[in-house]
Amino acid sequence: MMIPIRCFTCGSLIADKWQPFITRVNAGENPGKVLDDLGVKRYCCRRMLLSHIDIISEVIHYTRPI
């Protein structure tokens, strides 16, 4: 869905790093190097960014009106 605001494990703020991360990775940079440049050092935070799949555009079609 949408990237969580904080890491599930340590509580560190990660949402502010999502857009620069995905932009640079889509441009062809190495994800590990991008995370290092953004200051994401903990492996729990790194996995939150590396393993996230943004599927909100697919799920939005299945919502029903309230």
From Swiss-Prot:
Subcellular compartments = Cytoplasm
Task: Write the record's keywords in alphabetical order, separated by commas.
Answer: Cytoplasm, DNA-directed RNA polymerase, Metal-binding, Nucleotidyltransferase, Transcription, Transferase, Zinc
Q: Where does Zn(2+) bind?
A: C7, C10, C44, C45
By its UniProt entry, which Pfam families does this protein fall under? RNA_pol_N
Give the protein's biological function. Answer: DNA-dependent RNA polymerase (RNAP) catalyzes the transcription of DNA into RNA using the four ribonucleoside triphosphates as substrates.
How this chain assembles, per its entry, is:
Part of the 13-subunit RNA polymerase complex.
**Protein name, entry field:** DNA-directed RNA polymerase subunit Rpo10
Q: Which gene encodes it?
A: rpo10
